[in-house]
C-alpha cells in the first residue's frame, strides 16, 4: 500500500461580491466552514491558478459577472495506504465530496510520497 498526495479542483459560486479578493475570501471561508464540522481540517484549501491564453501570465481563478463570482479552489489532502493513484483519487473525491455536496470536483494531480 502506498501513500498519495491528491489535489482536486472545485468550482465555487459566490454571490453578491464586487471584487475578486472578496470572492476568494468568501469562497475559502465557506469551504472551510463546510469541511471543519466533518473533521476535515486536514484538507488544504487555496485559490487555483489560471494562465492567460494570450500572455501565459498566471492569475487567480476568479471570474465575476453581475456581482456573482465563480472561484476555482484547489483542495489538497494526503491519502494513506491506497492501492493505486486511481484508488487514492477516488478516496479523496469521496471524503471531500461528502462535505462539499453539490460542488463540482475534479482530480488535478496525484503524487506518491513516502
Swiss-Prot record:
InterPro entries: UPF0212. Signal peptide: none annotated. It comes from the Archaea. Belongs to the UPF0212 family. This is UPF0212 protein Mbur_0968. It comes from Methanococcoides burtonii (strain DSM 6242 / NBRC 107633 / OCM 468 / ACE-M).
